[in-house]
């Protein structure tokens, strides 16, 4: 696992929390640290303070003794300032209280550390270690559609060529990725791609069938995207969004607003939907946000996927097509 490799550990490593939301809320972590603080001196053999290249603390890890084999609990600090300060204060109290016999620093690349966290949570989910779901696995055919894949690749490559983009040099963010059917088509085109969806079962199936790479998949709510994704991307994609109904239009507006915040200048948006009615709403909602783009009739008689596309380029803070 990347988590062990990144931290240079020989023993197994586990997260105290079981989701990205859990990593931000930090409730299990605070309980764990509270229990550690009550241990007598020298109870913990060793610990790590995890720091970035500049020396700032981004997490900690504690070694746990067990007859069947020692293991580590890893604690990444939350992004929110108050939560991070609370966790760091409790960690420092444990480290400075004589409870840990040996403490050393481990310098890591923050991007690699985040990738390791994603892989850990995605693999654990696919192995059904993080839920008690009794649903059967979706068949592999649910995650693959070569006809759709080819049409998506053609559309993406055509738009890139017409607008002077080199996809192989671009990092992409795909929102609402589902089980990764569309991801399988486009990930070979980009330098790298991060995929998010709030459906645990969809991410689980995508990782299990290989349409989603575990180190590049996250179960997070797109309405709170910037809470969990701090980076900006060269391309932001939402492929076969929906279904968009009257009652959930406000939710989609929030998703669009969050998605746009993660796009770099000189990057592009590409959203696809099934119906003209959905596209009319999408284009109008984005125009209300000051985003004007091209609406593309991409219908195909063979299936319902990606019938309408919206494409916009961001340049000097403004959108055009």
Language model segments and positions:
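A short acidic, Gly/Pro-enriched loop at the edge of an enzyme's catalytic core
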Residues: 227-237
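Conserved class I S-adenosyl-L-methionine
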Residues: 167-178
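Conserved alpha-helix/loop element of class I SAM-dependent methyltransferases that forms part
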Residues: 143-168
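N-terminal accessory regions of S-adenosyl-L-methionine
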Residues: 1-148
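A short glycine-rich, Lys/Arg-flanked "PGG" loop and its adjoining helix->strand segment in the class I
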Residues: 251-265
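Conserved beta-strand signature within the Rossmann-like core of class I S-adenosyl-L-methionine
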Residues: 266-274
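Conserved SAM-binding strand-loop segment of SAM-dependent methyltransferases
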Residues: 212-224
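Conserved SAM-binding loop of SAM-dependent methyltransferases across substrates and taxa
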Residues: 179-190
């Amino acid at each position: 696992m990347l988590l062990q490799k990144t931290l240079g550990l020989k023993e197994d490593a586990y997260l105290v929390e079981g989701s990205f939301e859990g990593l931000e809320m930090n409730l299990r972590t605070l309980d764990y640290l509270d229990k550690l603080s009550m241990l007598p001196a020298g109870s913990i053999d060793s610990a790590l303070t995890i720091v970035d290249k500049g020396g700032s603390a981004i997490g900690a890890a504690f070694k746990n003794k067990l007859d069947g084999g020692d293991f580590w609990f890893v604690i990444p600090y939350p992004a929110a300032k108050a939560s991070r300060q609370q966790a760091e204060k409790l960690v420092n109290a444990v480290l400075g209280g004589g409870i840990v016999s040996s403490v050393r620093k481990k310098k890591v690349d923050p991007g690699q550390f985040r990738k390791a966290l994603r892989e850990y949570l995605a693999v654990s989910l696919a192995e059904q270690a993080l839920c008690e779901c009794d649903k059967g696995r979706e068949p592999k055919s649910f995650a693959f559609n070569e006809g759709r894949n080819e049409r998506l690749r053609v559309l993406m490559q055509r738009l890139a060529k017409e607008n002077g983009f080199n996809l192989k040099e671009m990092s992409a963010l795909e929102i609402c990725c589902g089980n990764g059917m569309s991801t399988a088509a486009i990930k070979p085109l980009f330098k790298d791609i991060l995929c998010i969806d709030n459906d645990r079962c969809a991410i689980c199936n995508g990782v299990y069938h290989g349409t989603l790479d575990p180190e590049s998949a996250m179960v997070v709510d797109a309405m709170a995207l910037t809470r969990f994704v701090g980076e900006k991307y060269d391309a932001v994609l939402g492929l076969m969004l929906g279904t968009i109904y009257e009652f959930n239009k406000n939710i989609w507006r929030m998703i669009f607003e969050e998605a746009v915040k993660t796009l770099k200048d000189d990057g592009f948006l590409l959203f696809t939907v099934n119906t003209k009615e959905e596209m009319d709403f999408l284009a109008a909602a984005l125009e209300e946000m000051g985003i004007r783009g091209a609406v593309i009739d991409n219908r195909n008689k063979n299936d319902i996927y990606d019938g309408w596309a919206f494409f916009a380029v961001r340049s000097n803070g403004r959108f055009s097509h």
